[in-house]
A protein has these predicted regions:
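Conserved histidines in hydrophobic membrane contexts and catalytic metal-binding motifs
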Residues: 1-352
């Protein structure tokens, strides 16, 4: 196969991936951009849950009592956050919701200064929950995550073929950075944005495939249910005893012991302290909270603990496919019109 034939083959693959899957790629990528800063968006959508208030003036157990009275009977406390705005308590409902996506979580928000109840509801806004479910499974029951994984393969292939097609056919490779490689704005946007976002988009696609790989291979069809841990309804240590053993200062997030891990997890800054619920033994993770909490490929994909620069790149990596999809389709339609005009002119000339 000659270089021209190979380039044309890559072009056809790149073109038809973009045309056929644009309507799926665009919302999938945009929801990914939303999830990079899901906490910030949740604050915008539910401002009352994050309203500024005074410093914590009560003991953690007092906040816990307020939350228990506000939650439905039979709810199981999972976590508490103290020190950043209102105190937030997260719990699982008495019965599974039966809804698709991650298990439903209830939230209770408490004024830290007075201990008064601010509000109750889902732990995150319905919009953000929808974004999580759509990005992870396209709202498709069962096989949705596998479908998203194969879309990641297509996106990775599109990124690689796009980079190949960006490379100038003649002359120095630096010609590829020229803004006016083409006579139309959409084509110039497509080539310039496509080059700069190709590597981040490829990383996003590859890590997305890794996350979905078990489901793509037909195993572990419900990973959230398999990995779900049940918080202990009754613990040996009280909340106050666990925090006293941890000896932490400032904002903290406390996670309750579970049936699989019988330890209190107390996150303070970049430090994770574990307190054994049976004997109060304390251990400290010296390598940081984030690295223990999530694998590196997941943090590459969602930006957790990766710094502002990478989060901005990920955000743009979610916006770019929308621009590339629209400009690519415009370029394709223009080419179709041009070919139709050429064919009509040839037919007119032949008829004379």
């Amino acid at each position: 196969m000659s270089k021209v034939q190979l380039r044309n083959a890559w072009f056809q693959i790149h073109k038809w991936i973009g045309i056929l899957l644009a309507l799926v790629f665009i919302p999938l990528s945009l929801t990914g951009s939303m999830l990079v800063w899901d906490d910030a968006l949740d604050r915008m959508l539910e401002p009352s849950h994050y309203a500024p208030s005074g410093p914590a003036a009560l003991s953690p157990s007092q906040y816990l009592d307020v939350a228990r009275h506000a939650l439905p009977a039979g709810s199981t406390i999972q976590a508490m956050r103290i020190g950043e705005g209102p105190v937030m308590v997260t719990a699982s409902p008495p019965k599974p919701s039966g809804m698709r996506g991650p298990p439903l979580r209830l939230g209770v928000w408490i004024d830290p200064a007075s201990g008064k109840l601010i509000g109750t509801g889902l732990s995150n806004s319905p919009v953000m929950r929808w974004a999580h479910i759509f990005h992870g499974s396209l709202q498709i029951p069962g096989s949705g995550r596998a479908v998203v994984g194969w879309l990641g393969v297509a996106m990775l292939l599109s990124s690689l073929t796009g980079l190949w097609l960006w490379w100038p056919v003649t002359g120095s490779w630096t010609r590829g950075f020229r803004w006016k490689r083409h006579t139309t704005l959409d084509a110039n946007l497509h080539h310039m944005i496509g080059f700069w976002i190709a590597l981040p988009l490829g990383i996003l696609s590859l890590t997305g495939v890794i996350i979905a790989w078990p489901q793509m291979m037909g195993s572990d069809t419900n990973p959230m249910r398999r990995a779900m841990q049940t918080p202990l309804a009754t613990t040996h240590l009280t909340l106050d005893q666990a925090l006293t053993a941890a000896s932490v200062q400032g904002p903290v997030t406390i996670t309750w012991p579970t049936d699989k891990e019988g330890v209190w997890k107390i996150a303070s800054g970049q430090k994770m302290i574990q307190v054994d619920d049976r004997n109060g033994a304390v251990s400290v993770a010296k390598d940081g909270m984030m690295s223990r909490a999530r694998p590196f490929y997941r943090r590459l994909h969602d930006g957790t603990g990766m710094g502002l620069v990478w989060q901005i790149i990920l955000f743009l990596g979610g916006i770019a496919p929308a621009v590339l999809g629209v400009t690519g389709i415009v370029m394709w339609l223009r080419t179709r019109r041009w070919r139709a005009d050429v064919a009509q002119r040839k037919a007119t000339i032949a008829a004379r």
